[in-house]
Amino acid sequence: SNAGFLGGLAAGFLAGYIIVFLKKLFRGMPKSLEGLKPILLYPLLSLFIVGTLMYFIIGPIFSSINTAVVHFLSDMGTANAVLLGALLGGMMSIDMGGPFNKAAYTFSIGVFTDTGDGSFMAAVMAGGMIPPLAIALATTFFKNKFTDEERRSGLSNYLLGISFITEGAIPFAASDPLRIIGSSIVGSAVAGGLTQLWNTAIPAPHGGIFVIALAERPIMFLVALLVGTVIAGLLIGFWRKPVKQ
């Protein structure tokens, strides 16, 4: 099928709703046949229904949408690419592993899978690396703004950040959401936009600094990452109030 990742997402949601419908449909079956539901009826019927709908209806629709998306991305000018890169980068920091983060990541993975273009992967990877790196930076240079426990935890975010594990920032974001998330969004958006401005690309779905050897224009990717990290780290450091030990 040429439906691409959008069609795959639609198929997943469709399969879930069909299973819910089938459970209601067969609710009145004799209990002696209860064991057939999960091992025979649900899998076979849902596969048949989803497959039929995908082949005749959903597949062609999303194939056209996917083709339009590919053409749009191919014809996108630098200004639009920078804006989209900034949006994707910022989304990675909004909820740090939640729906916005996963939506940006899934979109970039889909574009990479369908077109082989890893430019948006560079944007989301930079955006996802910045929250933990910015926290690590802030806890290092603004010690009076964090407790002893936070400073110790902040050190581990250096490793988490370079590994593209955004979730390392969640404990800090939970305790101070406005300052941590707000600062991280700004830094991640700047970094995401810069990756597109400087035409960087990472043809890998994960890995952080450990896949930098695969990147196109890796030096510029690192510069974008550094700029975003410094901006977010400084915002966190100056925005937070000193803590009383």
Predicted regions: what is each one?
Residues 1-31, 35-243:
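Pore-lining transmembrane helices
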